[in-house]
Swiss-Prot record:
Organism ancestry: Eukaryota, Viridiplantae, Streptophyta, Embryophyta, Tracheophyta
Coiled-coil intervals, chain numbering: none
Main location: plastid
Keywords: Chloroplast, Plastid, Thylakoid
One CC-aspect GO term: chloroplast
UniProt protein name: Unknown protein from spot 103 of 2D-PAGE of thylakoid
Miscellaneous information on this protein: On the 2D-gel the determined pI of this protein is: 5.7, its MW is: 14.3 kDa.
Organism: Pisum sativum
UniProt subcellular location: Plastid, Chloroplast thylakoid
Top-level taxonomic group: Eukaryota
Length: 14
């Protein structure tokens, strides 16, 4: 998903 990772900066994989 995007924007829902541990950073929330639009990461593709968290």
């Amino acid at each position: 998903f995007k924007g829902g990772g541990p950073y929330g900066q639009g990461v593709t994989r968290g």
